[in-house]
Swiss-Prot record:
Gene giving rise to this polypeptide: acpP
Pfam families in UniProt: PP-binding
Main location: cytoplasm
Organism lineage string: Bacteria, Bacillati, Chloroflexota, Dehalococcoidia, Dehalococcoidales
Keyword Cytoplasm applies: yes
Cellular localization per UniProt: Cytoplasm
Name the record gives this protein: Acyl carrier protein
Job description of the protein: Carrier of the growing fatty acid chain in fatty acid biosynthesis.
Keyword vocabulary terms for this entry: Cytoplasm, Fatty acid biosynthesis, Fatty acid metabolism, Lipid biosynthesis, Lipid metabolism, Phosphopantetheine, Phosphoprotein
Cross-referenced PANTHER family: ACYL CARRIER PROTEIN (PTHR20863), CARRIER DOMAIN-CONTAINING PROTEIN (PTHR20863:SF76)
Length: 86
């Protein structure tokens, strides 16, 4: 059973090459995990893939993506959109 946080952490490690120990709720993608703007776009796309299903595409609008600066912000956003721990 994977929590939303664990899934966000997995995607962050894969996309950003970050160390697992560094991907904590308060971590900033840019400041703590070294993501540049392109990395952040690719991270959002990977999150859309991770949390979408073949039957229900999951999309994070650019206006929302711009606000997702930390790991916890992403977790909170996903939960607000109905994503649950599995």
């Amino acid at each position: 059973m994977a929590t939303v946080f664990e899934r966000v952490k997995k995607v962050s490690v894969e996309q950003l090459g970050a160390e697992e120990k560094d991907v904590v709720p308060a971590a900033s993608f840019a400041d703590d995990l070294g993501a540049d703007s392109l990395d952040q776009v690719e991270l959002i796309m990977a999150l859309e893939t991770e949390f979408g299903t073949p039957d229900a595409k999951f999309e994070i609008p650019d206006t929302d993506a711009e606000k997702l600066k930390t790991v916890q912000a992403v977790v909170d956003y996903l939960k607000s959109k109905g994503i649950k721990d599995s």
